[in-house]
């Protein structure tokens, strides 16, 4: 068991080093996926021996270990193949070759520089869905790896694979899921594509109009789409979105009374007129809460950065447990579309926080925001 623990530690140290180095070379990402593969092999072997924990890490079931190892092998082999081409000299981030990107449509391809477009179903702006158009798609075909752009037309989003169009998003299928009338509009920056009548009423195989192809320029900044009249806009529009039913019953008066009383009780416990209120993370105002006649505030540090780097830092912080009281898991704000996440570190006093910041090495790519919180469980 000790041998397995040592091998697991070695694999995880290598993985963390790859996160911290933030390399843009394919050969370094091959090393990362080899380490992930070996990590899951060690966990698989441990589970075979009925070991459910290696030190503090829970060992997943055999099926999970096997599935993760297979994904690591698949991506590692694809990268080793791509490394033999002229594309190896390009910049490749760990995000470009991560598992999520590999399984994002079009699957089993590498992709770069995605830009979002909007598709309005039934001509309604409030019934819209976002899709990604990739500036470059790298696929392995009959002649090895090829780099092509993805393209938008009224049928969907596609790329050309060995001379054939491969649609990885079909707007006709999406209209069945999200709309009622089978019509849609595609909005890309200040350009729009409208669905012909023949497409909205028949399957794509029966369509023979002149194709209007727009190759989306992914370097353009996204602008507000222009207002336009959709195909079939004069038809009666449905008032509800698919899968949602309007609420027709009035809330129980007893529940309403209870909710009002609870809100009033909470408002009485929070003193919003206190002059010590501060501006906190995300632009919200932090209020000092009065508890037993005094203000109980706890010093904290919010760390902002890419999720993998934050997880790496949190792992490293376990060596300095004496310098903080608690540390959160990785989280993000739900009302923003950003790739950054946060972790929060709680301290018993200002001195402990200062010691933490002096001792723990925090990478420059992670932003440090200091503040205070109330009502924190110590």
Curated annotation (Swiss-Prot):
Ranges for region DNA-binding domain:
297-378
Which Pfam families does its entry note?
Answer: PPV_E2_C, PPV_E2_N
Q: Which keywords appear in this protein's UniProt record, sorted alphabetically?
A: Activator, DNA replication, DNA-binding, Early protein, Host nucleus, Isopeptide bond, Phosphoprotein, Repressor, Transcription, Transcription regulation, Ubl conjugation
* PTM comment: Phosphorylated.
Superkingdom of origin: Viruses
Please give the chief subcellular localization of this protein. Answer: host cell
The compartments listed are: Host nucleus
Positions of the region Disordered? 221-281
Named from the GO MF annotations, one term is:
nucleotide binding
Q: Where is the composition biased (Low complexity)?
A: 221-230, 268-278
Does the record bear DNA-binding in its keywords?
A: yes
Q: Name one GO cellular component term.
A: host cell nucleus
Disulfide bonds listed in the record: none
Q: Which InterPro entries match?
A: E2/EBNA1_C_sf, Nucleotide-bd_a/b_plait_sf, Papillomavirus_E2_C, PPV_E2_N, Reg_prot_E2, Regulatory_protein_E2_N, Regulatory_protein_E2_N_1, Regulatory_protein_E2_N_2
Q: Where is this cross-link: Glycyl lysine isopeptide (Lys-Gly) (interchain with G-Cter in SUMO)?
A: 304
Spell out the residue ranges making up region: Transactivation domain.
Answer: 1-200
**Alphabetical GO biological process terms:** DNA replication; DNA-templated transcription; regulation of DNA replication; viral DNA genome replication
Q: What does this protein do?
A: Plays a role in the initiation of viral DNA replication. A dimer of E2 interacts with a dimer of E1 in order to improve specificity of E1 DNA binding activity. Once the complex recognizes and binds DNA at specific sites, the E2 dimer is removed from DNA. E2 also regulates viral transcription through binding to the E2RE response element (5'-ACCNNNNNNGGT-3') present in multiple copies in the regulatory regions of the viral genome. Activates or represses transcription depending on E2RE's position with regards to proximal promoter elements including the TATA-box.
Self-association and partners:
Binds DNA as homodimer. Interacts with protein E1; this interaction greatly increases E1 DNA-binding activity. Interacts with protein L1; this interaction enhances E2-dependent replication and transcription activation. Interacts with protein L2; this interaction inhibits E2 transcriptional activity but not DNA replication function E2. Interacts with protein E7; this interaction inhibits E7 oncogenic activity. Interacts with host TAF1; this interaction modulates E2-dependent transcriptional regulation. Interacts with host BRD4; this interaction mediates E2 transcriptional activation function.
The record's similarity note reads:
Belongs to the papillomaviridae E2 protein family.
The protein here is known as Regulatory protein E2
The species this protein was found in: Human papillomavirus 30
Q: What is the lineage of its organism?
A: Viruses, Monodnaviria, Shotokuvirae, Cossaviricota, Papovaviricetes
UniProt lists the gene as E2
């Amino acid at each position: 068991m000790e041998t397995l623990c040592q091998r697991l530690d070695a694999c995880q140290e290598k993985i963390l080093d790859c996160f911290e180095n933030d390399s843009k070379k394919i050969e370094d990402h091959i090393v990362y996926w080899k380490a992930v593969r070996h990590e899951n092999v060690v966990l698989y072997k441990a589970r075979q021996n009925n070991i459910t924990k290696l030190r503090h890490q829970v060992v997943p079931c055999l099926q999970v270990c096997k599935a993760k190892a297979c994904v690591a092998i698949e991506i590692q082999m694809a990268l080793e193949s791509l490394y033999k081409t002229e594309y190896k000299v390009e910049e490749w981030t760990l995000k470009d070759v991560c598992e999520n990107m590999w399984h994002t449509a079009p699957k089993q391809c590498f992709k770069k520089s995605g830009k979002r477009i909007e598709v309005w179903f039934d001509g309604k702006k409030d019934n819209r869905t976002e899709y990604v158009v990739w500036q470059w798609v790298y696929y392995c075909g009959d002649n090895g790896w090829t780099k092509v752009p993805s393209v938008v037309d009224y049928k969907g989003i596609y790329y050309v694979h060995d001379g054939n169009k491969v649609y990885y998003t079909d707007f006709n299928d999406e209209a069945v899921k999200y709309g009622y009338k089978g019509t849609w509009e595609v909005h890309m920056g200040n350009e729009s594509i409208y669905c012909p009548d023949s497409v909205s009423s028949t399957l794509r195989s029966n369509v023979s109009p002149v194709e209007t192809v727009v190759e989306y320029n992914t370097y353009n900044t996204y602008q507000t789409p222009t207002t336009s009249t959709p195909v079939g806009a004069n038809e009666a529009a449905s008032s509800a979105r698919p899968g949602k039913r309007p609420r027709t019953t009035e809330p129980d008066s007893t529940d309403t009374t209870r909710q009002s009383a609870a809100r009033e009780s909470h408002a009485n416990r929070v003193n919003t007129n206190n002059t010590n209120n501060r501006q906190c993370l995300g632009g919200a105002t932090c209020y000092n809460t009065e508890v037993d006649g005094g203000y109980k505030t706890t010093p904290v540090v919010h760390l902002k950065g890419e999720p993998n780097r934050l997880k790496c830092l949190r792992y490293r912080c376990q060596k300095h447990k004496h310098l903080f009281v608690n540390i959160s898991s990785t989280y993000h704000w739900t009302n923003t579309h950003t790739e950054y996440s946060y972790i929060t570190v709680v301290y018993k006093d200002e001195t402990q926080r200062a010691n933490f910041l002096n001792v723990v090495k925090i990478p420059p790519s992670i932003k440090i925001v200091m503040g205070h919180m109330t009502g924190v469980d110590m």
